Amino acid sequence: MAFNLKGRSLLTLKEYTPQEIRYLLDIAKQVKAERKAGIVHQRFVGKTIALIFEKRSTRTRCAFETAFGEEGGHPVFLSTDDIQLGAKESIEDTARVLGRMFDAIEFRGFKQETVEILAKYAGVPVYNGLTDEYHPTQVLADLMTIEEEFGSLKGRKLVFVGDGRNNMANTLAIGCAKMGMHYVINSPKELWPSESFIKEIKDMAAENGGTFELTSVPGEGLEGADAIYTDVWASMGEEAKAEERERLLRPYQVNEEMMKKTGRDDTIFLHCLPAVKGQEVTFEVIEGKQSRVWDQAENRKHTIKAVLIATLL
């Protein structure tokens, strides 16, 4: 079923229905197949997108640039050293100006408030390429990767091990709840999300036939998991907390012993990257036969292209 998403922004995934997320994943599957078959389209000829980056990036920047450029569009990279975003010019005014010059805007940075303001004032679609709170384009790629592996999403079990209140844990919670999956956070209680967020996700999951659970016992809740997911212990901008996180999260390292706790040989390992091998995950796991991190990375491009197609055409 097709949906009219033209003009929509992508800020958290909360604003998209399960059916709309399904639609985006179906487009992503189509464009990936086209790419592999050598089929070339020029869907974005004459269109431009501003790519604003407060935080450095490999996958997000490359995915947006290639997804847009392959379709004949013109991406323009703007670091916050290059523009006046929130410095000599307000975010609101920057949004208004860029909205007159570009067909869309991507923002990757610290505050969720910034991307929300851009979306409110730009008058064109705005995409969250990562903030401290949410990372929706990554989770679309994660969902695509899980579906490629197992053929479906509903009823699948994903366990996030590590910092349970970071942007990945938050957005995976939304994505899993929307798609009727069973989501578990295995994390120290000090790093659990807020009570209000937990309630919101539990209600969302129940509405769609999924579940949301949390446990603080290292390695607990992994039984029967289709996928185990982790992320760096100290996110960008949290370098000062690295030593404290090391102390808290060392028991939560994803290693071969933890992977075996699922009781399955076909459980896959996921990571949004970049990874600190030997810290949150061992070399043996991330480089092993159960790892799908490189498929995830590739799928960033296909899912981002799907979002662009759905919201710009």
Swiss-Prot record:
* Enzyme Commission number(s) from the entry: 2.1.3.3
Instruction: Give the catalysed reaction(s), semicolon-separated.
Output: carbamoyl phosphate + L-ornithine = L-citrulline + phosphate + H(+)
Specify which residues bind L-ornithine according to the UniProt entry for this protein. Answer: N167, D231, S235, M236
Q: In terms of domain of life, where is this protein from?
A: Bacteria
Task: Tell me the keywords, alphabetical order.
Answer: Amino-acid biosynthesis, Arginine biosynthesis, Cytoplasm, Transferase
What are its GO biological-process terms?
Answer: arginine biosynthetic process via ornithine; citrulline biosynthetic process; L-arginine biosynthetic process
Which Gene3D superfamilies does this one have?
Aspartate/ornithine carbamoyltransferase
Q: What class of enzyme is it?
A: transferase
Any one cellular component term from GO for this entry? Answer: cytoplasm
Positions annotated to bind carbamoyl phosphate: S57, T58, R59, T60, Q84, R108, H135, P136, T137, Q138, C272, L273, R300
Pathway(s) of this molecule: Amino-acid biosynthesis; L-arginine biosynthesis; L-arginine from L-ornithine and carbamoyl phosphate: step 1/3
Q: Which GO terms describe its molecular function?
A: amino acid binding; ornithine carbamoyltransferase activity
A Pfam match is OTCace_N
Locations listed in the record: Cytoplasm
To which protein family does this belong?
A: Belongs to the aspartate/ornithine carbamoyltransferase superfamily. OTCase family.
HAMAP family xrefs: OTCase (MF_01109)
* Role played: Reversibly catalyzes the transfer of the carbamoyl group from carbamoyl phosphate (CP) to the N(epsilon) atom of ornithine (ORN) to produce L-citrulline.
- The name on file for this protein is Ornithine carbamoyltransferase
